[in-house]
Amino acid sequence: MKKKLFFALLVLILSSCSLFFQKEYGTITIDLEGGRARSINSSTGLPNLADSELEIDILTEGNSSIYKKILASEPKFFQADFPIGSRLEITVKLNGPSSSWSAHNSHTVKEGNNDIRLLLNKNASSLANVGFSTAAVVNKYEFNIAGKRIDINSRELPVFTRDSRGRLYIAYKDINWKLNRYESDGTPNNFASDSPILTTITGASSVNLASDPVTGKVYVAADSNLYRIKDDGAVTPTGGTAHPAGPIAVYNNNLFVLGVSAVSGNNPLKMFTITEEGSVLTLNQAGSLIPVSTGQITISTSGSETTINVDFKDILVKKDKIYILFAKNNLPTPSTPSPYYSLGGMLEYTYNSSGVIDNPQKYGFNDTVTAGDDIVTAGEANFYGPACFIGYDEQSISIADDGCTFKKEGGSVRIYKNVNRIFSFNTSTKSLYSYATENKWFNEYEETATPPPPLPVRLARSYCGRKIVIRGIPRSAYLSRVAQFVCKTL
């Protein structure tokens, strides 16, 4: 009897200890459609919650994580239990047709139900890559956004930007400059034909576009004048302040312009602060002009060195970094001397409120390259010809790489293959990786085929339906193929 009482007492003690040490849990609730999330709907140009995919990522103190994807057809509702006192880092991302909006909350779990307050940013946190290709027809380009094709006819290379809603703006030139706008799903949303923005750019010699991802404002540079493009097509001009003509980028009311120098060697990089007062933009230069050298790459050939002057292609700003793309090629033509190459790279500058710091970091190229057999090879890890920035997310930026490779045959160099790739650059780890794409970008280089050397006509004719008689030369399969080639041409 005593043994039974002792055993029962032991069980009771162990059960009490188990209850004493057991963790208590609280429930977190994420309810974007019926809870405390910022309203998002199509009337603002943003996607409907009910029609969009939602990703939830929860990181705990022990660095373990919970990931949940809620499909567009499912309610945007999530619940899970966590130990009381746990510190959670909660990130949600709402995915539209070609862009995403995110929200973040740091939360300590309390007893009972924990409603998580998430304010989705009004500006897109990531923009899916824009695809585009040069078409078989001269001066025709095919853009692709959210699976929809957009045909553009332009006598000059079209320029484009994406705004904070994921909308696509394309400036192009037929006789005069024009501007089209498309929703993030590719639906046209053009300006009225009499909009001030259209009359402003029509006669310009050059046009560049930029969007501020922080403020959501869109800008156009027509020649050396900057204008803000309002949603209805109205414009806000600068008050007589000119800036260098060239690629532009805007970030948090800071304008960055890479000018084109009249003297080969350095292009001026300038930073301005933008102030909008009433109906006028005011530009104030921040810091000193930074000379960006065009002599980024030196080619070593037989002991001599030649520095090539590259062309600057595009500029992008994220947080406190400025990214600049450049490219240059020398293609094999009868009038062009060797060495032949298709090269490029990216520069990264840092800036602050005082201006740009002149200490660029270099990615995707080598300062010095060596020519062999009249060819300079970039290498798979490097750029062949970066064309422009095509998208970004919170960790990386995407770049269109548009170049070609070469091959030497029979004493002459020919274009061997087109290189159409997308480079992804991680802005934190500074790592680059590339992958192939079906997009042709701005250029599709002609892949020249080298025919086999011709045989004497007498020899070719003797092969065409007759017996070949070649004294001292073996009748190999190679000679047969060569003779067949010549027969077709006779």
Curated annotation (Swiss-Prot):
Q: Where is the signal peptide?
A: 1-16
Q: Where is the lipid attached (N-palmitoyl cysteine)?
A: C17
Q: Does the keyword Ion transport apply?
A: no
Query: Can you tell me where the transmembrane regions are?
Result: none
Indicate whether Transmembrane helix appears among the record's keywords: no
List the S-diacylglycerol cysteine lipid attachment residues: C17
Where does it mainly reside?
Answer: membrane
Its record classes its membrane topology as: Lipid-anchor
Q: Name one GO cellular component term.
A: plasma membrane
Compartments annotated for it: namely: Cell membrane
Q: Which organism is it from?
A: Treponema denticola
Protein name, UniProt field: 53 kDa membrane antigen A
Query: Could you tell me the keywords of this UniProt record?
Result: Cell membrane, Lipoprotein, Membrane, Palmitate, Signal
